[in-house]
């Protein structure tokens, strides 16, 4: 009985890991590529290694200046931000509680409400990089940093790459 239970638990966790990877791969393969303006915030975590915390232009929104289906939002609310491509970047065009039936949108969570403003996280706020590269990206903060994301039809976003001055950062060298 112990062997069967151990095997069952192992299979259960294997399915979870495969499901997580498949979910991200689905978004990368089927998602629409969108460029987002960003700037790095913090490049290092002693326990997790080098990564870049990214702060997007679409992360702080004034819901009085954008169409919305709600008069008030609260922390932890799920929101859907509609986007249009303008001058090659994804820019917000509305904030909604329910996913739009069509068009490009990104799913997020309200992290803070500040007057008429919302701070929204999309699950793409950190990007792990090879050791020693986080500080290099941080030093580039005065330059134009962009993030190429894939957004699937459900609004899920996955980072595909980082770009500085329009050139993709290659971490291989």
Predicted regions and their residues:
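Long, non-globular segments of proteins
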Residues: 3-4, 21, 31, 41-42, ...
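Extracytoplasmic
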Residues: 31-33, 76-78, 142-146
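Short extracytoplasmic
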Residues: 38-68
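Cell-surface/extracellular proteins and modules involved
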Residues: 28, 51, 60, 168-173
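Hydrophobic membrane-insertion alpha-helices, especially the h-region
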Residues: 4-23
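Aromatic-capped interface at the extracytoplasmic side
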Residues: 17-38
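Short, compositionally biased
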Residues: 65-88
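Extracytoplasmic/periplasmic terminal helices and flexible tails
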Residues: 81-86, 92-96, 106-173
């Amino acid at each position: 009985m112990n062997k069967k239970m151990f095997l069952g638990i192992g299979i259960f966790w294997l399915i979870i890991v495969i499901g997580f990877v498949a979910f991200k791969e689905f978004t990368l393969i089927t998602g629409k590529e969108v460029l987002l303006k960003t700037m790095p915030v913090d490049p290092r975590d002693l326990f997790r290694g080098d990564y870049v915390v990214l702060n997007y232009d679409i992360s702080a929104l004034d819901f009085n200046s954008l169409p919305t289906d709600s008069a008030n939002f609260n922390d932890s609310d799920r929101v859907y931000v509609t986007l249009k491509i303008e001058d090659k970047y994804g820019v917000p065009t509305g904030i909604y509680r329910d996913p739009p039936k069509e068009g490009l949108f990104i799913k997020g969570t309200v992290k803070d409400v500040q007057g008429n403003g919302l701070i929204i996280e999309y699950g793409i706020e950190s990007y792990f990089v090879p050791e020693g590269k986080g500080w290099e990206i941080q030093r580039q903060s005065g330059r134009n940093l962009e993030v190429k994301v894939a957004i699937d039809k459900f609004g899920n976003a996955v980072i595909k790459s980082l770009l500085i001055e329009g050139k993709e950062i290659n971490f291989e060298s």
